[in-house]
Structures are given as C-alpha cells and as structure tokens.
Amino acid sequence: MERIKLTFMDCNYAIHKDCGVVVATAKFKIFGEVLTIKGKAMCPPSMFDENIGKKIARARAERSAYIRARQEIKIIKKRIERQLNIVNSSLDFFNDCITHQDDYINEF
C-alpha cells in the first residue's frame, strides 16, 4: 500500500541539567516541505537522566510531527473531496445528456 511519508531528517538537543529539561528540535520532510518541530521532556533535577530525557523529547517531537502531518493531509483531503464532487456532478450531468440524446434520437 502506498502512503504519504513523513521523513525524519535531523534532531538536535538542548540539555538543561540544572532545571531537568531536555528540548529536542527535530526536522522532518513532507510534501517537499521541511517542518521544524520541538519536543520537551522535564523532570525534577534530582532525577535527571540525559539519555531518557532525549528519548522522551524526541518522541514528543515525532508525535507532534505526526499530528502536523495529519492536519496537512486532512486539508488536502478536503480539497480533493471538493474536486471529486465536481467530477461526480459533471458525470451525472453528462449521463443525463446522453440519455436525453438517446431518447431524442429514438423519436425518429
């Protein structure tokens, strides 16, 4: 099955041990556009673990990127549905025209 892809590009971390915060700034690509998304992990400084903080911050950035991608796809879907309605309406109209012409021709 084919699908639209959200491609991970890069991730940088800002580590603030003194306040127990890790911020991941990740870049993703979708539809040729680069998205820069941040994710944050926090805990009390006494429980700070840099590796766990990085994993959580990156996972939150990825989750936010998926949400953003879903929003973009929903917008595209609405546009496509509007266009599909025009196509379906046109097909119905042309079918009616063909039926009308068939009826007209059969009168002779």
Residue ranges and their predicted role:
Residues M1-F108:
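Catalytic phosphate/metal-binding cores of nucleic-acid and nucleotide-processing enzymes, i.e., regions
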